[in-house]
C-alpha cells in the first residue's frame, strides 16, 4: 500500500507552530498538504506523524475523515516515520514534510508512476535539486 507520511511538530525555534498558522484562505500548512495529497491517484492513506506530546494536531482526525494520526518519539523523526509505516502496514512510503504546503499532486503522481515503472527502492526530487524548495518528495519501499 502506498501511503503518504507527513512529519509535523509544534516546536520550531524560528517560528513555533508554523505548520498550524493560517496562510492561504484561512487554511494552515498541514490542512493544505492533506487536501493536495487527497488529489493523488496513488496515495491510499495519509498519515500525520507527530510527537507523543502533541495535542494540537488531534483536530485533524475530525476535520479530515481519511487521515490517520500517529504519535511517536519527539527527537527521533526517522523512528517516527518507520514506526508509523510499520503500525499501518505501509509498503511504500511517500515522505512529505509539513512545511511544504505547495506540494503538487500532479508531480507526486508522476513521481510515484516513475518509481513503480523503474522498480527502484528510492526515488526523490531533492537529492539533486530539480524543483524549488517546498516541492520535496521522497518515495521509498519499506522492507521488513
Annotate each language-model stretch with its function.
Residues 7, 96-97, 125-126:
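Short beta-strand segments
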Residues 28-45:
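A short, N-terminal amphipathic alpha-helix
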Residues 52-116:
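Short phosphate-binding loop-to-helix
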Residues 1-16:
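N-terminal nucleotide-binding beta1-loop-alpha1 segment
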Residues 47-51:
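Short internal beta-strands
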Residues 43, 90, 117-121:
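Short, high-confidence coil segments that cap the C-terminus of an alpha-helix
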Residues 103-144:
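Conserved core of the sugar-phosphate nucleotidyltransferase
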Residues 18-24:
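Short glycine-enriched, charge-decorated loop/helix-capping segments at active-site entrances
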Amino acid at each position: 500500500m502506498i501511503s503518504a507520511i507527513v512529519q509535523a511538530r509544534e516546536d520550531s525555534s524560528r517560528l513555533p507552530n508554523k505548520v498550524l498558522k493560517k496562510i492561504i484562505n484561512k487554511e494552515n500548512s498541514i490542512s493544505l498538504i492533506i487536501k493536495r495529497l487527497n488529489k493523488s491517484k496513488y496515495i491510499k492513506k495519509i498519515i500525520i506523524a507527530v510527537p507523543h506530546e502533541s495535542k494540537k494536531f488531534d483536530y485533524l482526525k475530525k476535520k479530515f475523515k481519511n487521515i490517520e494520526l500517529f504519535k511517536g518519539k519527539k527527537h527521533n523523526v526517522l523512528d517516527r516515520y518507520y514506526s508509523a509505516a510499520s503500525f499501518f502496514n505501509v509498503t511504500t512510503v511517500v515522505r512529505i514534510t509539513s512545511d511544504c504546503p505547495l506540494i503538487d499532486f500532479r508531480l507526486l503522481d508522476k513521481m510515484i508512476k516513475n518509481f513503480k515503472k523503474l522498480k527502484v527502492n528510492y526515488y526523490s526530487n531533492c537529492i539533486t535539486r530539480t524543483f524549488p524548495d517546498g516541492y520535496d518528495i521522497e518515495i521509498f519501499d519499506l522492507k521488513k
